[in-house]
Amino acid sequence: MTEVKSKKPLLEAIQNGEQNIKVTDPKSLLACLVAEECDNDKSNVKKFLNVILGSKNVVDMQDRPKIRIGIVNEKGKVWRMFINLSICSTALGIIDILNDTYAKIKVEKDERGNLTGNVEIV
């Protein structure tokens, strides 16, 4: 079991073919990953989530839950999208987000201009 709590070790573990990854703070990691990748382009969000959460070497491909995600950027604009993901109950630890969950991700910039985010599961 590889435990990770930020983006760099997560990506390294995925690239190294780790089969069993536990994310210690899944909601904030997911939010930061999404915030970072999508700033103002919702197609990037979709692509990114599919790559990270749908990664074949990490995630069990049996069920394909649908997650509804709303992203609020710093201008208050909300994107809503439906994303089909391949998920198992433990992969990445992010995945107690169950079928048809609505996740609201708020994207903000901190005082240094870095994107941050938080996830609210509704």
Protein language model regions, located:
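Short amphipathic alpha-helical surface micro-motifs
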Residues: 2-6, 87-89, 98-101
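Membrane-engaging insertion elements
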Residues: 61-79, 91-122
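Terminal export/targeting leaders at protein ends
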Residues: 1-45
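Long intrinsically disordered, low-complexity regions that are acidic and Ser/Thr-rich
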Residues: 40-83
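Membrane-active amphipathic alpha-helices enriched in small hydrophobic residues
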Residues: 55, 83-95
